From Swiss-Prot:
Residue numbers bearing the Phosphoserine modification: 59, 86
Gene from which the chain derives: SPL2
This protein's UniProt keywords: Cytoplasm, Phosphoprotein, Protein kinase inhibitor
Entry protein name: Putative cyclin-dependent kinase inhibitor SPL2
Induction note: Regulated by phosphate, probably through its PHO4-binding elements in the promoter.
Subcellular location as annotated: Cytoplasmic granule; Cytoplasm
MF GO annotations: protein kinase inhibitor activity
This protein's GO CC annotations: cytoplasm
SS bonds (residue pairs): none
Superkingdom assignment: Eukaryota
Protein task: Putative cyclin-dependent kinase (CDK) inhibitor necessary and sufficient for PHO pathway-dependent down-regulation of low-affinity phosphate transport.
Length: 148
C-alpha cells in the first residue's frame, strides 16, 4: 500500500503529490477537475533542486511538470454527476415562464402600436360616419365642464 507525505504543491491548478515510496507513479483528477500528478521522491528532489539552483521561472517549472510522462489529463466528466434534462426543463418551464412569455412575445411593441392605430382609425371612422356631429353627450363624463 502506498502512503503519501503531506507535501502537496499547487501550481496553476496542477497538484504534485510526493510518494514516500519510490515505485509507481500515477496521474489522476481531483474532485474539482484539476489535474494531479504524483511523482516519486527522486523526481521531487530533482524538481526541487532544479528550481532552487537553476532559478527557473515558474512558467518553465510548470512546462517541465506538464512534460513529465506520468502527467496525463483525465476526463472530468466521470467525477461529476450528470444533470437530468427533466430538471432543467422544469426550471425553465415554471420559474421563468411569465418572464419568457413577456420577452419572447413576438413584436409586442409593434402589436401595441397596431392596436392603437386600429382604435384611432375606428374612432375617426365613427366621427366621420356621424357627419362630424359633436353633441353634448361626449361631455357627460368630462370634469372640466360646468354643471348647471
Amino acid at each position: 500500500m502506498r502512503t503519501y507525505t503531506p507535501l502537496i504543491y499547487n501550481i496553476y491548478n496542477v497538484h504534485i503529490w510526493v510518494f514516500t515510496e519510490s515505485q509507481g507513479q500515477i496521474g489522476q483528477m481531483s474532485p474539482r477537475g484539476k489535474m494531479e500528478t504524483a511523482v516519486s521522491q527522486g523526481q521531487h528532489k530533482q524538481l526541487k533542486d532544479g528550481h532552487q539552483h537553476k532559478g527557473r521561472k515558474l512558467s518553465e517549472e510548470i512546462a517541465s511538470l506538464l512534460r513529465l510522462k506520468e502527467c496525463r489529463r483525465l476526463n472530468p466528466a466521470s467525477y461529476y454527476t450528470p444533470r437530468r434534462t427533466s430538471q432543467s426543463q422544469s426550471l425553465s418551464g415554471s420559474t421563468f415562464k411569465e418572464y419568457n412569455e413577456y420577452v419572447n412575445e413576438k413584436d409586442s411593441s409593434r402589436a401595441q402600436r397596431q392596436n392603437a392605430a386600429a382604435v384611432l382609425s375606428k374612432l375617426a371612422h365613427d366621427f366621420w360616419e356621424n357627419d362630424c356631429v359633436i353633441d353634448e353627450d361626449i361631455f357627460e363624463d368630462s370634469s372640466d365642464e360646468e354643471q348647471s
